[in-house]
Amino acid sequence: MCIRDRHRFRVLPIVNENDTTATDEIQFGDNDLLAAKLAKIFKADLLIMLSSVEGLYESFNDQTNQSTLIRQVSKLTKDIHAMAGKASKSGKGGMTSKIEAAKIMLSMNSNMVITKGDAANPLLRLKKSVQSTWFNKS
């Protein structure tokens, strides 16, 4: 069964690009962009990105070890791209690829949220409005 058939039966497939077997010809780039492209195909209203961090941070103060979480983004500006920084050490794209995924979602007037995925019950926590960054058109 292909992904579209599964969607027709209201089955949500979990798709993960295997970095060790993906070739240049069939590579999507990373799982963040793959998720956004699939969300676009299925005209999803919302893409939930589970991450190792709570969302996009505006700044980090080395002296206080504190950072400022951006709670809402309605437009992807140069400042937002700058906040994303460079690719992460653990993954391929880090926050930069999540911003690119948000660009895809915003281009189709859909929403995206980044929230911490390694906490217990991340979707329930998101429903309770925990720390996260929402991307939506204003």
Model-derived regions: residue spans:
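C-terminal catalytic "cap/lid" subdomain
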Residues: R4-S138
